Design a protein with these regions (language model features):
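Ribonuclease/tRNase effector modules and their secretory precursors
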Residues: 1-124
Length: 124
Protein backbone atom coordinates (compact mmCIF):
# COMPACT_ATOMS: atom_id res chain seq x y z
CA UNK A 1 0.00 0.00 0.00
CA UNK A 2 1.43 3.33 -1.07
CA UNK A 3 0.22 6.83 -0.17
CA UNK A 4 -0.08 8.61 -3.52
CA UNK A 5 -1.37 11.97 -2.32
CA UNK A 6 -3.87 13.88 -0.25
CA UNK A 7 -7.35 15.12 -0.97
CA UNK A 8 -7.03 18.89 -0.70
CA UNK A 9 -10.20 20.19 -2.33
CA UNK A 10 -12.44 21.98 0.19
CA UNK A 11 -15.59 20.84 -1.67
CA UNK A 12 -14.81 17.25 -0.65
CA UNK A 13 -14.59 18.24 3.02
CA UNK A 14 -17.75 20.34 2.69
CA UNK A 15 -19.61 17.33 1.27
CA UNK A 16 -18.30 14.51 3.51
CA UNK A 17 -16.98 16.29 6.59
CA UNK A 18 -14.03 14.77 8.44
CA UNK A 19 -12.37 12.35 6.04
CA UNK A 20 -9.05 10.58 5.79
CA UNK A 21 -7.36 12.93 3.35
CA UNK A 22 -4.45 10.60 2.58
CA UNK A 23 -5.17 8.48 -0.49
CA UNK A 24 -3.56 5.10 -1.00
CA UNK A 25 -3.10 2.89 -4.04
CA UNK A 26 -2.62 -0.82 -3.40
CA UNK A 27 -0.76 -3.34 -5.53
CA UNK A 28 -4.05 -5.19 -6.06
CA UNK A 29 -5.68 -2.04 -7.49
CA UNK A 30 -2.69 -1.43 -9.76
CA UNK A 31 -3.11 -4.99 -11.10
CA UNK A 32 -6.82 -4.32 -11.66
CA UNK A 33 -6.09 -1.11 -13.58
CA UNK A 34 -3.42 -2.82 -15.69
CA UNK A 35 -5.65 -5.82 -16.45
CA UNK A 36 -8.94 -4.03 -17.05
CA UNK A 37 -7.88 -0.73 -18.58
CA UNK A 38 -5.21 -1.73 -21.09
CA UNK A 39 -2.24 0.64 -21.10
CA UNK A 40 -3.89 3.41 -19.06
CA UNK A 41 -1.74 2.87 -15.96
CA UNK A 42 1.49 2.66 -17.91
CA UNK A 43 0.70 5.77 -19.95
CA UNK A 44 -1.13 7.91 -17.38
CA UNK A 45 -0.55 6.39 -13.93
CA UNK A 46 1.93 9.13 -13.10
CA UNK A 47 -1.01 11.58 -13.15
CA UNK A 48 -2.96 9.84 -10.37
CA UNK A 49 -1.54 12.02 -7.54
CA UNK A 50 -2.09 15.24 -9.50
CA UNK A 51 -5.64 14.20 -10.41
CA UNK A 52 -6.53 13.51 -6.77
CA UNK A 53 -4.83 16.64 -5.43
CA UNK A 54 -5.77 19.13 -8.18
CA UNK A 55 -8.83 17.80 -10.06
CA UNK A 56 -10.70 19.75 -12.70
CA UNK A 57 -13.96 18.02 -11.72
CA UNK A 58 -15.25 15.99 -8.82
CA UNK A 59 -18.41 13.95 -9.37
CA UNK A 60 -20.32 11.72 -6.95
CA UNK A 61 -20.85 8.06 -7.76
CA UNK A 62 -24.55 7.15 -7.92
CA UNK A 63 -23.98 3.59 -6.66
CA UNK A 64 -21.87 4.36 -3.59
CA UNK A 65 -22.37 7.53 -1.57
CA UNK A 66 -18.78 7.38 -0.31
CA UNK A 67 -17.13 7.23 -3.73
CA UNK A 68 -16.03 10.16 -5.88
CA UNK A 69 -14.71 10.51 -9.41
CA UNK A 70 -11.72 12.86 -9.58
CA UNK A 71 -11.25 13.97 -13.19
CA UNK A 72 -8.37 15.94 -14.66
CA UNK A 73 -7.43 16.89 -18.22
CA UNK A 74 -3.88 15.71 -18.98
CA UNK A 75 -1.99 15.63 -22.25
CA UNK A 76 -4.66 14.91 -24.88
CA UNK A 77 -7.24 13.16 -22.71
CA UNK A 78 -9.03 13.11 -19.35
CA UNK A 79 -8.08 10.87 -16.45
CA UNK A 80 -10.73 9.55 -14.06
CA UNK A 81 -9.47 8.42 -10.66
CA UNK A 82 -12.24 6.78 -8.63
CA UNK A 83 -11.65 7.15 -4.88
CA UNK A 84 -13.43 5.44 -1.99
CA UNK A 85 -13.64 8.02 0.79
CA UNK A 86 -12.76 6.89 4.33
CA UNK A 87 -13.99 8.82 7.35
CA UNK A 88 -11.54 10.08 9.98
CA UNK A 89 -13.96 9.41 12.86
CA UNK A 90 -14.21 5.67 12.12
CA UNK A 91 -10.79 5.07 13.72
CA UNK A 92 -10.30 1.93 11.63
CA UNK A 93 -6.92 2.95 10.29
CA UNK A 94 -8.29 2.83 6.76
CA UNK A 95 -7.36 5.59 4.38
CA UNK A 96 -9.23 6.87 1.36
CA UNK A 97 -8.22 4.63 -1.52
CA UNK A 98 -8.06 4.49 -5.30
CA UNK A 99 -10.53 1.96 -6.66
CA UNK A 100 -9.64 2.38 -10.32
CA UNK A 101 -8.25 4.78 -12.90
CA UNK A 102 -8.94 5.09 -16.60
CA UNK A 103 -9.01 7.52 -19.50
CA UNK A 104 -12.21 9.35 -20.37
CA UNK A 105 -13.07 10.69 -23.79
CA UNK A 106 -14.86 14.03 -24.05
CA UNK A 107 -18.23 12.41 -24.84
CA UNK A 108 -18.04 10.13 -21.81
CA UNK A 109 -16.93 13.02 -19.61
CA UNK A 110 -19.88 15.12 -20.83
CA UNK A 111 -22.29 12.24 -20.14
CA UNK A 112 -20.93 11.80 -16.61
CA UNK A 113 -21.21 15.55 -15.98
CA UNK A 114 -24.83 15.41 -17.10
CA UNK A 115 -25.80 12.28 -15.13
CA UNK A 116 -23.83 12.57 -11.89
CA UNK A 117 -23.92 15.18 -9.16
CA UNK A 118 -20.99 17.56 -9.43
CA UNK A 119 -19.43 18.90 -6.24
CA UNK A 120 -16.53 20.71 -7.90
CA UNK A 121 -15.73 22.20 -11.30
CA UNK A 122 -12.67 24.40 -11.71
CA UNK A 123 -14.48 26.19 -14.56
CA UNK A 124 -17.12 27.62 -12.19
Amino acid sequence: MKVIGRIKNQCVFDHWGQIQSEVVLTAERIRHICEDHNDDYEEYGRYIPETVEIPNLILLDKKDQNTALFIRHVEDTNINVVVKIAYAFENTGRKSSVITMYRLGEKTKARLMKNLKMIYNDQD
